[in-house]
UniProtKB/Swiss-Prot annotation:
Modified residues (Cysteine persulfide): C403
Family label: Belongs to the HCP family.
Gene3D superfamilies the UniProt entry points to: 1.20.1270.20, 3.40.50.2030
Stored Pfam families: Prismane
Name this polypeptide is given: Hydroxylamine reductase
HAMAP family: Hydroxylam_reduct (MF_00069)
A Gene Ontology BP annotation from the UniProt entry: response to hydrogen peroxide
Organism phylogeny: Bacteria, Bacillati, Bacillota, Clostridia, Eubacteriales
GO molecular function: 4 iron, 4 sulfur cluster binding; hydroxylamine reductase activity; metal ion binding; peroxidase activity
Gene: hcp
Length: 549
């Protein structure tokens, strides 16, 4: 069986995975993801018509949000889960059509196939999936723009899901997801119209990150400067990875007083910066590094492991039986924690009971790392920052947000951080931080040279900080600030962050370690000519370029 996927930075040969995903997903899972997307496009077409009639169904919006999230890189590898999602999607789509008719609407005679096709067996799903994948769009520029839009929607959906878990939603974001998905079925749209939609996705990218920022800070307080322990204690423990702060809250409540410690991994590290989580004495610290090192770090952790969102790597047998997934995450043979019931906490008792029987983590490092520099914290020391710029103590800021990954070429970011002049400050968010957040880079007048705002969605904080600095310095354009953007990308959340920055007018962003394989030469040219998007070269040449040497 063949497949085609080029949504992540590590895609085979930089052009696409065709036999098995570099991420580990099989061809049948990749194809079922394509089919689920196809069904959701049909749902979106019907949803747009329903909305015109005043019909807004939260169950439909939630399904599309979670369905998009489930197809993100390293989220779900479970064939059976996707078969079930396709069936659920078809049923929802048809019930939505019934609502339209009941409300007096007339279904168009020429509905796109995605809004009418139906089947029930896994065999029929397999046959259809082979016909509706990425390569079904023959024009490479149209294909490139459609996929760029879809990947932006996937990132948007991930952030919307985190906000939704905390009780925050925005109907306009859901409506745009539907508009965007439906647009990818419309062969009448020109390249210019698709480019406009991609940029509109950036607008909603800003909105969804602002919504999630509000959800997180209202629920847990504003992140504050925090020292995070990276050593271990001698108690049984649970390692929580992913991004879902509501899951962390539920887990901390349920483990309190049990003798089980809780550690974060990967993108969950910034949870330590939120005031609400500091009251838990058993919330010990952060264990390990970025997602791609989990094959070794999950092994040495010894305890139970909970994956709340991506990034999951196909697990080794040595820890598979102590791994749990929840939410959109899934892997065949790995225990899954069901969704929380309305008004209740998610039941993590199975994770906790297993953890009690397991040995304490093996120590892999000691010390502390510092973070918590989201917009509110930076504004609290804004006078200090502004004075440092005016005095010349700080010559330039470098936004190095984004993702980490397996490729050896990503060592560039470690060396780049080391090579930056001492009068520069790195602003970061996302797991890209692990390339340099444990280096001794010092400080400038008490301001650490690495300011970590948080998770990848906290790139929003970096944008807010830039806009505030523009205002403070009385500039007309954010690009007049002494800020350079050298961003590492890996998956689709980085795509929506990029589109959000473009919407905010940020230009001359450098993207690496490679440019996306889903950008056709012509689409890449549009981004280069209109926004100054560029790749990376060597550390020395890039530092000189950014510093104007």
């Amino acid at each position: 069986m063949s497949m085609f996927c080029f949504q992540c930075q590590e895609t085979a040969k930089g052009t696409g995975c065709t036999i098995k995903g570099v991420c580990g997903k099989t061809a049948d899972v990749a194809n079922l993801q394509d089919l689920l997307l196809y069904v959701m496009k049909g749902i979106a077409i019907n949803s747009l018509q329903a909305r015109e009639l005043g019909i807004v169904r939260q169950d439909v919006d939630k399904f599309v949000m979670e369905g998009l999230f489930a197809t993100i890189t390293n989220a779900n590898f479970d064939n059976a889960r996707f078969v079930a999602l396709v069936r659920e999607g078809l049923a929802l789509r048809d019930s939505l059509k019934a609502d339209i008719v009941k409300a007096g609407g007339v279904l168009p005679a020429n509905l796109h196939d995605s809004a009418t096709w139906t089947a029930d067996s896994a065999e029929e799903f397999e046959q259809k999936a082979a016909q509706v994948g990425i390569l079904a769009t023959e024009n490479e520029d149209v294909r490139s723009l459609r996929e760029l839009l879809i990947y932006g929607l996937k990132g948007m959906a991930a952030y919307a899901e985190h906000a939704f878990a905390l009780g925050y939603e925005d109907n306009s974001i859901f409506a745009f997801m539907m508009k965007g998905l439906a647009a990818t079925t419309d062969d009448s749209l020109s390249a210019d119209q698709l480019v406009a939609l991609v940029l509109e996705a950036g607008k909603y990218g800003v909105d969804v990150m602002a919504l999630l920022d509000k959800a997180n800070t209202t629920s847990y307080g504003n992140p504050e400067i925090t020292k995070v322990n990276i050593g271990v204690r001698n108690n049984p423990a649970i390692l929580i990875s992913g991004h879902d702060l509501r899951d962390l809250e539920d887990l901390l409540k349920q483990t309190e007083g049990t003798g089980v410690d809780v550690y974060t991994h990967g993108e969950m590290l910034p949870a330590h910066y939120y005031p609400a989580f500091k009251k838990y004495a058993h919330f010990v610290g952060n264990y390990g590094n970025a997602w791609w090192k989990q094959d070794k770090e999950f092994d040495s952790f010894n305890g139970a492991i909970l994956l709340t969102t991506n990034c999951l790597v196909p697990p080794k047998d040595s820890y598979k039986d102590r791994l749990f997934t929840t939410s959109v995450v899934g892997y065949e043979g790995v225990k899954h924690i069901p969704a929380r019931e309305a008004g209740k906490v998610k039941d993590f008792s199975a994770v906790i009971e297993l953890a009690k029987t397991l040995p304490a983590p093996t120590e892999i490092e000691t010390g502390e790392i510092v973070g918590g520099f989201a917009h509110n914290q930076v504004f609290a020391v804004a006078d200090k920052v502004v004075e440092a710029v005016k005095s010349g103590a700080v010559k330039r800021f470098f936004v190095m947000a984004g993702c980490d990954g397996r490729m050896k070429s990503r060592d560039y970011y470690t060396e780049f951080a080391k090579a930056l002049p001492q009068d520069t400050i790195i602003l970061t968010a996302g797991c890209a931080k692990y390339k340099y957040n444990k280096l001794a880079l010092g400080d400038i007048g008490g301001i650490p040279r690495v300011l970590d705002a948080g998770q990848c969605n906290d790139s929003y904080s970096l944008a807010v900080i830039a806009l505030k600095l523009k205002e403070v310095f009385g500039l007309d354009d954010v690009n007049q600030l002494p800020i350079s953007y050298n961003i590492a990308w890996y998956e689709q959340k980085a795509v929506i962050v990029l589109l959000a920055l473009l919407y905010l007018g940020v230009k001359n962003i450098h993207l690496g370690p490679t440019l996306p394989g889903f950008l056709s030469p012509n689409v890449a040219k549009v981004l280069v000519e209109n926004f100054g998007i560029a790749g990376i070269t060597t550390v020395e040449d890039d530092v000189n370029l950014f510093m104007g040497a």
